[in-house]
């Protein structure tokens, strides 16, 4: 184990357009090679597209989509006497948010639409309606945890 103290969680500066810390984290996760302005253009473009398509507040739509993608439980490998068990554990709120964002962005990148703005907008709208690849990933994770519920007494 590390001899150093636990690292402190850095504060994220809220994004300038909506004043949302969650959205700022989302932009930072989408960013590739430090190109934040491009990531912001993509996210804001997707949010504008969502607002035009649904005539709802795009930030609320994004938050609902993230809520539908965030996992409640996940499995972690635990080695006991030569056998490796997939032990279901609850996900901490900060990790839950991070996983939800990561899965949403990964699912958007794999979509077939033209341009990342359209891909992200489509994936967020799908996630809001509880469908799409990101929601499927969450369901698979929950199914895995449910299947390995018998090993939950191996928690640490």
From Swiss-Prot:
GO terms for biological process: translation. GO terms for molecular function: rRNA binding; structural constituent of ribosome; tRNA binding. Pfam families: Ribosomal_S7 (PF00177). Coiled coil: none annotated. One of its GO terms (cellular component) is small ribosomal subunit. Keywords: Ribonucleoprotein, Ribosomal protein, RNA-binding, rRNA-binding, tRNA-binding. InterPro entries: Ribosomal_uS7, Ribosomal_uS7_bac/org-type, Ribosomal_uS7_CS, Ribosomal_uS7_dom, Ribosomal_uS7_dom_sf. The keyword Ribosomal protein applies. The keyword Ribonucleoprotein applies. NCBIfam families: rpsG_bact. Belongs to the universal ribosomal protein uS7 family. One of the primary rRNA binding proteins, it binds directly to 16S rRNA where it nucleates assembly of the head domain of the 30S subunit. Is located at the subunit interface close to the decoding center, probably blocks exit of the E-site tRNA. Part of the 30S ribosomal subunit. Contacts proteins S9 and S11. This is Small ribosomal subunit protein uS7. It comes from Methylococcus capsulatus (strain ATCC 33009 / NCIMB 11132 / Bath).
